[in-house]
Amino acid sequence: MLLEKIVEAISGRSEDNGKKVKGTIVLMKKNVLDFNDVNASLLDGVLEFLGKRVSLQLISVVHADPGNSLQGKRSNPAYLEKWLTTGTSLVAGESAFDVTFDWDEDIGVPGAFIINNFHFNEFYLKSLTLEDVPNHGNVHFVCNSWVYPAKKYKSERIFFANQAYLPGETPEPLRNYREKELVNLRGNGNGKLEEWDRVYDYALYNDLGDPEKGKQYARTILGGSAEYPYPRRGRTGRKPTKADPKSESRIPLLMSLDIYVPRDERFGHIKLSDFLTYALKSIVQFLIPEFQALFDSTPDEFDSFEDVLKLYEGGIKLPQGPFLKALTDSIPLEILKEIIRTDGEGKFKFPTPQVIQEDKSSWRTDEEFAREMLAGVNPVIISRLQEFPPKSQLDSEVYGNQNSTITKEHIENTLDGLTIDDAIKTNRLYILNHHDILMPYVRRINTTNTKLYASRTLLFLQDDGTMKPVAIELSLPHPDGDELGAVSKVYTPADQGVEGSIWQLAKAYVAVNDSGVHQLISHWLNTHAAIEPFVIATNRQLSVLHPIHKLLHPHFRDTMNINALARQILINAGGVLEMTVFPAKYAMEMSAVVYKSWVFPEQALPADLIKRGVAVEDSSSPHGVRLLIQDYPYAVDGLEIWSAIKSWVTEYCNFYYKSDELVLKDNELQAWWKELREEGHGDKKDEPWWPKMQTRQELKDSCTIIIWIASALHAAVNFGQYPYAGYLPNRPTLSRRFMPEPGTPEYEELKTNPDKAYLKTITPQLQTLLGISLIEILSRHASDEIYLGQRDSSEWTKDQEPIAAFERFGKKLSEIEDQIIQMNGDKKWKNRSGPVNVPYTLLFPTSEQGLTGKGIPNSVSI
C-alpha cells in the first residue's frame, strides 16, 4: 500500500474529490502464463514504480467529439491500481485489478475503451466491468486478448462493450472506431508477421515442402491452381525459399510452437500442464530419425497379437540408440513420461483403447467391421448402392475400364433370399467405395514400401438392423498402363482355414484405405482446412460488434493454431502423417484432388445423408429426412445435434435480422461472404452452388453449416481415433505387401501362422508406436475445453433474448445427452455398441478432461 502511495506521489497522480466510476479489470500477467520468463514481473514492477503504467480511456457511445472527426468523446486516462501487489487472485492465474475513472457527464454511456500498456511485457486481458455508470448501471466489456506494450502497435488497442450492432445501427460515435479496427486486423499484405501482430490474411499451402533440404522434400503447392485447388490458410509472411521462390520458407523444428498465427489465436490461454501435451506433437518429431534408423537396421515386427497387447498391458521396450539417449538426457523426466508413456524403464505404454477393453478379438468379426462404418471414427463415407455392378466415375480415356467386377454370383447367396435387384429396390445394399479416390495414386504409392489396393466393399442391411460385408473388391492399375483399366479380384466372407485368413486380410486392406481417407479427407480437409478461411474472413470483415461475429467466434477457438502446428510438424514433408499414413508424400496432394468435389451446402448433415443415399427427404420426419438405415448412430445423433444448432441459429438471426432487406444492406456481412467465396475458398469462387447471402434463410443455413463443421462433424471424426484406431490391427494405416498368392512362402505362412502374416502385412512396429502416440494426443480433451452449448463468458452479449435462446439450446443438448444414454442402453439398437461393446458417444455433447471418446467442443481445437 505504501509503495502504491509513493508511486502516485512520484508520478503526480493523486485522488481528487470529483465523481468517480469504478471498474474491475480481469487479466493474466505474462509471468503466470510463461514459465520461461521469470523476469517478466520484475521488469513490469520497475516500470510501474517509474510511473509507466497501464492506462485506460473510456469512449462515449452517445456523445461525439467535434474536434476528433466526430468520434466518441474520450474520458481522461485512468490507471490500473495495485499492479505491484498483484491484485485479487482469481482462478487459473487470473487477477482482478481496480481502475477508477473521473466521471465526465459528457461521456454519457461508455461503448468502448482504449488501453495503453506502458509495461515491458504483454498481458492477457479478459474483461472490464464498469459499476454503476450514472443513469445506466453496469457496462461489461469481454476482451479475451493479448495486450502488448504500446510501442509494438501502429494503432491504439480498442475494446467494445458487449452490445451487438448491425453496421447500419452502429451509434455514430463508434462507427469510425469500428471501421478502423477492421482495417487494422486486415493488415497491408506485406512483410513478415510478428508475434504481437493481430493480422488475419490469406496464403496458399506453399509451406509444406522444404525444397532447400533436397528434391525429396519438395511438395506440390496446394491452392491457386485448377489442378490442385485448396482452401486458404493464414498468412505468415515468411520469405520464399531460394530453391523455389513459390514455396515459403519454414521455421526450425525447435521453434514449431512459435509459428505465426494472430496473437489471440494462440494456445496461450491453456494452462501450462495442458500446454505441454501440445508440445508433444513437436517433440515426438525428434524421435522420428531414431525410429527411422531403428526401422532400417532392425525391422522389428509384432510377432503376435499378444505382442501388440503388451503396448497397453505391460509396455514394450524401446530399442536404445544414440539419438534416443541424447533425447532422454536433454528432456526433463516428467515431460518424457508424457511423451513416450515411459514407466521409467524406457518402455512405451499406452491406455487400453475402448475397442479391446471388453473383448480382445471382437474387432475381427464381420459385424464389427461393418458397424464401424456407421458408428466408428469415419461414419461419413458409406453410401447406398444404386446400381449394380458399381461403376467408376474416372475418365475412361485415361484410366480405362474401372467398373467393378463383382458379379451376382459373388453375393446373391448372402442376401437372405433376395435377388440383387430386390435388395437394391428395398434399400438393403450399401457400399464403402474408396476406388475412385485412390486408383489414380495406387501406381505411384506402390513404388514405395507401401503396397496398396483401391477397394470397394459391398454390405447388406440385415433384418435386425446390422450390416454384414458380402464382398470386397481389391484393384490394382494394369501393369502395362493405366489406360488398360483395373486388375481386380473379388473376395467373399469366410471364417475357416486359409480362406478365412484371406478374408481377414481383405478387410485389413479396406481398413487401410478407410484410415487414410478418414485422416486426409473426412478429418483434415473437411473440418480443419475447410473451416480456416471462415476464421480468417470473420475476423477481417465482421466487427466484434457484429452479431454474426458474436455467434460464430466461439466456433473458431484454437483452429488457426492447431492448423499452423499441423503444417509445421504433421502434414509437412517428412512429417508424422507422411510416416504413418499410406499415401505418404502424396497425402496432401490427394486431398487437393478430392477438394475439387467439395460443395459447401452439401456439408449440411441432411444434405450429406441424402447425397450418399442413406436418407431421403421426408417432410413428415422430425428433421425433414428419413434414414434408410434406422440404426445409424452417427446419423441419428447427428440429426438431433444438427436440429438443435439450426433452431439456435434461427432464433439468434431472427432477433437481429427482421427482414431479408437487412441482410442485403449489411455491408460487413456482404463483404464477409464475398471474401469467403473469392479469397478464402477462392478456387471455388465461380461455383454456382454458393448461397447468394440475400435472404435470412441463406444466412441461417450458412451459419448452421459453419457451426456444424467446426463442432459436431469434427468431434465425430476426431475423438474416436484412439478408441478405435489406438489398436492398430483394427484400423491399420499401412499395408506393406500384397495379398499372398498360392504357392508362395507368404501363402504358406498364412496357412501356418495367420496372425503373424496379418501383422507383417499391416503397419510395422515403429510406425505403430508413432501413430498411437499421435492419435492419443489428438483424441484428448484439454482441461479448459469449451463444449457446444457453452460460452467462456456469461456476459458475451447484453441482449437478453439471444441469452434466453442460448439457454434453450443448452437445455436441448442436455435432453439429447439423455436420449443418447437411453438408446445406448436399449439392446434393440445393436449398432450402438456392437460386438466390442463400445457405446456410441462421439456426439454426446459434453465430456470430462482427457481420453473419453465423447464430447463436442465448440471448435476444431485439436
UniProtKB/Swiss-Prot annotation:
Entries under Pfam families matching the protein: Lipoxygenase, PLAT
Instruction: Respond yes or no to whether keyword Iron is given for this record.
Output: yes
User: Which residue numbers delimit the PLAT domain?
Assistant: 36-161
Where does it live in the cell? Cytoplasm
Biological process GO annotation list? fatty acid biosynthetic process; lipid oxidation; oxylipin biosynthetic process
Keywords assigned by UniProt, alphabetized:
Cytoplasm, Dioxygenase, Fatty acid biosynthesis, Fatty acid metabolism, Iron, Lipid biosynthesis, Lipid metabolism, Metal-binding, Oxidoreductase, Oxylipin biosynthesis
Per UniProt, residues of the Lipoxygenase domain are: 164-862
What highest taxon heads this organism's lineage?
A: Eukaryota
- Quick one: which residues bind Fe cation? 523, 528, 714, 718, 862
Tissues expressed in: Not detected in leaves, stems, flowers, roots, tubers and stolons during normal growth and development.
Description of what induces expression: Up-regulated within 6 hours after pathogen infection, ethylene or jasmonate treatments. Not induced by wounding.
Which EC number(s) are documented for this chain? 1.13.11.58
> Enzyme class, one word?
oxidoreductase
Cofactor(s) essential for the protein: Fe cation
Q: Name one GO cellular component term.
A: cytoplasm
Known role: Plant lipoxygenases may be involved in a number of diverse aspects of plant physiology including growth and development, pest resistance, and senescence or responses to wounding. May contribute to cell death during the hypersensitive response (HR) by the massive production of free fatty acid hydroperoxides. Catalyzes the hydroperoxidation of lipids containing a cis,cis-1,4-pentadiene structure.
Protein's name in the database:
Probable linoleate 9S-lipoxygenase 5
Name the lineage: Eukaryota, Viridiplantae, Streptophyta, Embryophyta, Tracheophyta
